[in-house]
Amino acid sequence: MKIFVTRISLVLLVLQVCAFASNSVVNLSHYDLMRVDFVRMKNEGVVGVIHEATYPRFDRDSYYGSRQDAATRAGLLWGAYHFGDATDPVRQADHFLEMVASRWHGQILRPDGVLLVLDFEKNDHYPGGTMRVDQAVAFVERIRQRTGKYPGVYGGENRLRTVLNGRGVSPLQRQILANCWLWVANYHSEPRHTAPWDHWHLWQYTGDGKCDLPRARFPKSVANIRKAERNIFRGSLAGLEDFWRAHAWKPAVEAAAQEKPGGNMPGARVAADR
């Protein structure tokens, strides 16, 4: 009986998710060593790719530029994330934006804009320690200051719930982070605990081959990637495209603003090619 009830619950979950969501975003990093077939990925229904750009300590993902070019040529939307650590968050944000801008300006064919994300998870495999909540706040505020847009915040559902409700986290800090859009990981079920956000925007339901959901509706592979990191957007495909364009950063906008006398981006540095 327990198994039967569990199966019914999973079926209901699938029906609920399919009714309002699109399984159309993939994320990648330098740990994905294969030559990614982005054309095949698009043919399988993927709309956007979010790729690691920078990680501790102040390093750059060597695959980022070439994959941005290949994904753009395949007609995919493009995003970038930074894996945060416990060092100076403003310097991290500047390093991240300079990397993204340099690769954007350095391509003949470039994406319309770049969706920006802070990877705010426990750091147990890079130097620099784990980013604190106050540092995450400083990071996203620096991104907003320089781009005019808040980035997304990525993390596991349980960790975000624990960290953001911990001692020393102020209501103001939660409020600032809630200005960002939420990308949350849960490989077992649809995320439910999203406070201070009203709901999730992207749900990473599988990574490294881990997924407890029905494979028919929640595939773990895509194109030539057998153990992909796949994500569901809370909305239709058209809604995803609108969301992406509304939140994406165009590096040329920052550069143009800074070139004008009295530009309205205080403290920003020109994101020149590196």
What are these regions (language model features)?
Residues G113-P196:
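Catalytic domains of cell-wall/extracellular-matrix polysaccharide-remodeling enzymes
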Residues V46, V100-W104, G148-P151, E157-R159, ...:
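Catalytic cores of transferase enzymes with a strong primary signal for eukaryotic protein kinases
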Residues S22-K149:
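Substrate-binding cleft of extracellular glycoside hydrolase catalytic domains
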